[in-house]
Structures are given as C-alpha cells and as structure tokens.
Amino acid sequence: RHPTEPDRLWRSFRWGATLELFILDARGERRPSTRTTRTAQYLSRAQMDWLKEGLLRSTARFKVVVNSVPITNFPFTFGNGEDRWEGYAAARDEILNHITERRIQGVWWLSGDFHLGCVGKLENSGTRSALREVLAGPGGQIPNPLYLSLVPPQFDFTTGENNYVTLRADPARNELTVRFVNGDGRAIF
C-alpha cells in the first residue's frame, strides 16, 4: 500500500538501472462521461501527471507500463472503445505525445483483457509506431477470434492459443525479450 494514500493502486517498482514497472489503475479513476471530450479522463489528473513525470525521469533502460486494457490502435472495430484507451482519445494522445515529443526511450506497454496474445506496434505508421505493446492472453479463456486479423506489419505475433507470457530484460544487449509459452510448456514466440 501507498504510505499516505492507502486506496491508491498505481505505483512503480524498479529493478536497478534495468527495468521500471509503472502499474496503472485504469478502472477506478476513469470518467466515462468525459470519454469523447478534449478533457477525457482515462486516468485521474494526479495519476496521469505521475506517469508522465515518472517516464520522463526514469533512468531505467526499460520502462514497462502495465495496464489492464490495451493502448494499441487496433485495425478493427471492437466495441466503441469505452473500456480502453482508444475510447479516450485526448488522454491517449496526451501520454503518447508526451513520450514521443520528449523522445523517452525504452517504453513498452503490457496489458491484456482482449482474450488474445500479441506483440505489436501501437500504431501502424507514424512516430507512435516505434512504441510497442504486449497483450497477455487469452490465459484460460475462450480465445477472441479477432486475433486472426492482427497481421504484419503492425503485429509481429498473434495467438488465440492458451498461454502465458514472460518478459526478460537484458540491459547489456539492450533487449527486452518477449516469450509466449503454451499449455504444453512449448515456446510459441
């Protein structure tokens, strides 16, 4: 728990100069009534400012933002986006513009919720295409058949197979290795 804000869920954890995890609360502070406005609130102002400042000041080689739902701009329509970053365009633009305009290096996103697994670019082209996201899933859930529509060049890997995912940060090689392992223990990516 946070020492002065015991109900606050968002926080960060650091492993030396190698990795810093930024854990978000993207459910408890969201304001759906603002979704389509210029002031869309996906995260509270305090949490957004904390994330922006943390990413800017972090000296960790890899900065992994852990979020319950994806920030990727998917090439298909999946609902109206009210439950993910895509539905809060102003908030999504604020954090992604902050990262790209300040040239913050080593930022990755890790999320789930779509009942599929993938590794890909946040956007198919433009400055945000350098940012990457890993979706963990489907776990033990029924796979989302939309994984079949996630193809290169935006997506390097997609699966509907039940699996778990690991990340390995190697600062000496400047690599963050993503590994998906199926129920039989076989690496599928």
Feature map (PLM): residue ranges:
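Metal-dependent phosphoester/phosphodiester hydrolase catalytic core
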Residues: 1-189
